[in-house]
């Protein structure tokens, strides 16, 4: 069994080759042990190489990945054929992903984005069979709006333990966070820096100067203050260390009030195939 997941995860999206291997090796050396990837990222071999060269035991790592339906442009409009959910097809893709990662199990697997209720329930049912075999330890979802989570709640074939969503000082969702706390669901934030848009914000910079921290650390600290874990990317040892040290920053009421004055509901990850958000 892998170690407990960290509050601050290493995000591996768009880590370029060969920089990715060096970045992941450095992160592991500095104390990261929770790694976020996805089948669509196509970087599993890089992660495997970095882990191998770092000599970190698999049991000390927490690896999470994501699955999604690809190359179906109108996948939110039509129900999939039963063949889309065939055990052999899913098994083949999952086994290839595990082979590329050079591991025989994942600590967590997420449904990357919602589609239709019948599709998502069918996929969760399939994933539960992998969970029963120990191939997947936990099954999560990502980008599921609150109304959709409530809609699925009584119909789920398995309990969910997490929803990974975009969250940052300009996009907080108190209703989602409250629902998560009252339903034993963890929230994992991605894009906690708002695609770097907040790093030059005068309010964030003012708070950073007060705490002798970087603007990125203030954004991360704000997420952590909501009892939210997060995934964040960095490509230099200095930034990797800064991100981890964000846990040490304690924001006060004045900081929270200033951050609350920032513009609200700014979503930076909203491609055409995104769900309809509440």
Task: Go through the PLM ranges and name each one.
Residues 1-61, 65, 71, 275:
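N-terminal binding-site loop/beta-alpha segment at the start of enzyme catalytic domains
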Residues 2, 48-58, 97-102, 131, ...:
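Acidic (Asp/Glu)-rich catalytic clusters
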Residues 32, 103-106, 136, 160:
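A structural motif
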Residues 59-72, 108-109, 143, 167:
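A short, structured active-site edge motif that brings together acidic residues
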Residues 72-85:
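Surface-exposed, active-site-proximal loop segments in enzymatic domains
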Residues 101-117:
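Active-site groove signature of glycoside hydrolases
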Residues 114-278:
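Beta/alpha (TIM)-barrel catalytic core signal, keyed to glycine-rich beta->alpha loops juxtaposed to Asp/Glu
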């Amino acid at each position: 069994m892998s170690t407990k997941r960290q509050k601050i995860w290493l995000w591996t999206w768009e880590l370029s080759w060969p920089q990715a291997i060096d970045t992941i090796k450095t992160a592991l050396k500095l104390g990261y042990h929770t790694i976020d990837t996805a089948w669509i990222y196509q970087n599993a071999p890089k992660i495997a190489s970095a882990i191998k060269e770092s000599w970190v035991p698999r049991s000390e790592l927490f690896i999470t990945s994501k699955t999604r339906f690809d190359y179906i442009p109108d996948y939110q409009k039509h129900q999939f054929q039963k063949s889309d959910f065939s055990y052999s097809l899913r098994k083949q893709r999952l086994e290839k992903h595990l082979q590329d990662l050079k591991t025989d199990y994942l600590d967590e697997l997420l449904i990357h984005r919602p589609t239709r209720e019948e599709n998502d329930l069918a996929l969760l049912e399939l994933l539960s069979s992998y969970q029963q075999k120990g191939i997947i330890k936990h099954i999560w979802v990502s980008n599921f709006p609150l109304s959709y989570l409530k809609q699925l709640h009584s119909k789920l074939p398995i309990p969910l333990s997490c929803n990974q969503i975009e969250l940052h000082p300009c996009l907080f969702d108190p209703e989602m966070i409250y629902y998560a706390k009252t339903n034993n669901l963890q929230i994992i934030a991605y894009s906690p820096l708002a695609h770097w848009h907040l790093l030059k914000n005068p309010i964030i910079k003012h708070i950073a100067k007060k705490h002798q921290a970087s603007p990125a650390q203030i954004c991360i600290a704000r997420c952590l203050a909501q009892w939210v874990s997060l995934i964040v990317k960095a490509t230099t040892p200095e930034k990797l260390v800064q991100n981890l040290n964000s846990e040490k920053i304690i924001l006060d009421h004045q900081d929270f009030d200033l951050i609350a004055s920032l513009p609200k509901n700014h979503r930076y990850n909203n491609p055409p195939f995104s769900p309809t958000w509440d």
